[in-house]
């Protein structure tokens, strides 16, 4: 059974074709600059170098057609025709309170996802456009929606409600939803396998650290709290996002900097985080290079980020009354040994200690704890596409 996984953004579309018989990626690619000049599709097979084709992609329908064309191409393709695709799994950022699990897509589901646009105006519209484009081109192939938010639907109300007038929650659905759920769930399950223990007997803190970052407290396989909130802006300082700040700063800035709602949203989402602090970059590789060259603000940005992660780990140890494993995942979590070391340092009183040599390993599943550590510290590469494909198979079989 071959599953096509689609992750549609506003001007890009990432995809993977996975053979679920042995869970191997047959091909993966990217359609970029959709609706913009100089658009292209890039595809690679296995370990082969990617092939890049300049192609006019006026909209997402053009992009999906380009994907099918590339997958079935005599030279760069991996299947003979579209009929070899058994199902399509779509990543959808926000399911609101309407979805607490992945679902087979039908018109009712589409309408419910559209109703979530209010709470996810940046992310859900391109996700919807991607589904509609697939439905036009592959009308007879079953499609599944996998939501970033559903793993966090197990959070208790005292964890997800904000202390605003309760009527605002009832009227607008203002509450913590959490994101990166597919990743948090996947790495928690992998941690359970690595530790050879049932998820039901484990307390795990998963740290998804990339350009967007979030922490999750996973107790007995369920998310009981997470750092992102109503939007992905809450929580840690990230690549370009401020993370949690005093809400009065918003009104102060609007007045002092003469900003409107869009202006202050752009400031908090696109110009803040480690980019805003450092003035250098949102990329940690650039920050480390600048810090090594003596840039104190780049060094400060890294310290602020690591301090934030450390605080969430402490918070979640408290709410779970302990922890068995801490997991690092995503681009920074998997590959940045300096950041991992800064986060874990000075937590040995909790039994959290890492081996410096093991910590140098990058991008592979590894236990980096010392032999005598009471808490296991694991590095686990995330695989959201495989997780989406597995959910798709589960629902369409």
From Swiss-Prot:
What are the catalytic residues? 148 (proton donor/acceptor)
- Per the record, a Pfam family? Acetate_kinase
Cell location:
Cytoplasm
Cellular component terms per the entry's GO annotation: cytoplasm
Which domain of life does this protein belong to? Bacteria
Task: Keyword check for Transferase, yes or no.
Answer: yes
Entry's EC annotation: 2.7.2.1
Asked if the record carries the keyword Cell inner membrane, the reply is no
Q: What is its main location?
A: cytoplasm
Report the record's Gene Ontology biological process terms.
acetate metabolic process; acetyl-CoA biosynthetic process
Positions bound to ATP = 14, 208-212, 283-285, 331-335
Pathway(s) annotated for this protein in UniProt = Metabolic intermediate biosynthesis; acetyl-CoA biosynthesis; acetyl-CoA from acetate: step 1/2
- What NCBIfam families does the entry give? ackA
Function in brief:
Catalyzes the formation of acetyl phosphate from acetate and ATP. Can also catalyze the reverse reaction.
Q: What is this protein called?
A: Acetate kinase
Q: What is the species of this protein?
A: Ruminiclostridium cellulolyticum (strain ATCC 35319 / DSM 5812 / JCM 6584 / H10) (Clostridium cellulolyticum)
* Gene name as annotated: ackA
